Amino acid sequence: MAEIKFRTPLVSDAYSIHKLVRDNKPLDENSLYLYVLLCHHFSDTCVVAEHDSRVIGFLSAFISPKAPDTLFVWQAAVDAEFRNQGIAKELVFSALSQTGPSVRYVEATVTPSNTASLKFLQNFATDLDAEFKKKPLFSSEILGKDHEQEDLVRIGPIQKNLLEVTA
């Protein structure tokens, strides 16, 4: 089996990323153009996992404009064939390692029914010996009646020296 490579995304990856997200319910599918923009403007904080030249994982993340010490993880997707191999965790570790020393927190939003993502985030915090906090952020009234509320998860402070040890 070929090795999995983690790297920054290229604009040419956007189509494959869009398809990967579309195939990863319950993630919200966004336009292809949005993924082009992420690959172009946020490549320093987004990560692609590649196997045999195929995109099999993607993490979209950015440094929060209101909290420059925080990496906000927006979406994480892994191809069904490659799940439960630690790829999602490595995507987040890779994104964190691309940031400067001032980033000490990870934030993400998660719906109450997305128990897999919630468990992943709790385990991620445990792996880094970091605090895990969760609170309501956006209500379904704001997001629309067909969308569950989104809770904000905050993990940290993160000691960057632990990234190499736990990866």
Regions found by a protein language model. Give the residues of each.
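Conserved beta-strand in the GNAT
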Residues: 48, 54-63, 70-72, 77
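A short, internal acetyl-CoA/4′-phosphopantetheine-binding micro-motif in the GNAT/acyltransferase core
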Residues: 75-83, 110-111
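Conserved acetyl-CoA-binding loop-helix of GNAT-fold acetyltransferases
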Residues: 78, 84-97, 119, 123
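Conserved GNAT acetyl-CoA-binding A-motif
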Residues: 99-112
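Conserved active-site alpha-helix within GNAT-family acetyltransferase domains
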Residues: 112-134
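C-terminal "cap" of GNAT-fold acetyltransferases
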Residues: 128-167
